[in-house]
């Protein structure tokens, strides 16, 4: 079973958000939540919320389909960050000049899944 959650237009640069997402990819969901809770990066809070939402979506999906749900079985199967729109601002400088400031945004997507049981032959 697979569940997905995403957050769009997060005010964190994609490069900084990718550093956080790389920490949790492939981890168990409970471990990933613990890692994010204590990660010092500012991007860890929105990623934590997205991962919590993905776990909640998995619980809802399991209830709908009548499947047994154990949160400790979930694994972060995919996690990625895409670049959102950039807000452009101007910083006034001396002698009538202006420097452009790019305020970048991110779209964070996290997919959790229960690993498939491999058949032993």
Curated annotation (Swiss-Prot):
Keywords: Ribonucleoprotein, Ribosomal protein, RNA-binding, rRNA-binding. One of its GO terms (molecular function) is rRNA binding. Pfam families: Ribosomal_L22 (PF00237). GO terms for biological process: translation. It comes from the Bacteria. One of its GO terms (cellular component) is cytosolic large ribosomal subunit. Gene3D superfamilies: Ribosomal protein L22/L17. This protein binds specifically to 23S rRNA; its binding is stimulated by other ribosomal proteins, e.g. L4, L17, and L20. It is important during the early stages of 50S assembly. It makes multiple contacts with different domains of the 23S rRNA in the assembled 50S subunit and ribosome. The globular domain of the protein is located near the polypeptide exit tunnel on the outside of the subunit, while an extended beta-hairpin is found that lines the wall of the exit tunnel in the center of the 70S ribosome. HAMAP family: Ribosomal_uL22_B. Belongs to the universal ribosomal protein uL22 family. PANTHER family: CHLOROPLAST 50S RIBOSOMAL PROTEIN L22-RELATED, LARGE RIBOSOMAL SUBUNIT PROTEIN UL22M. Part of the 50S ribosomal subunit. This is Large ribosomal subunit protein uL22. The gene is rplV.
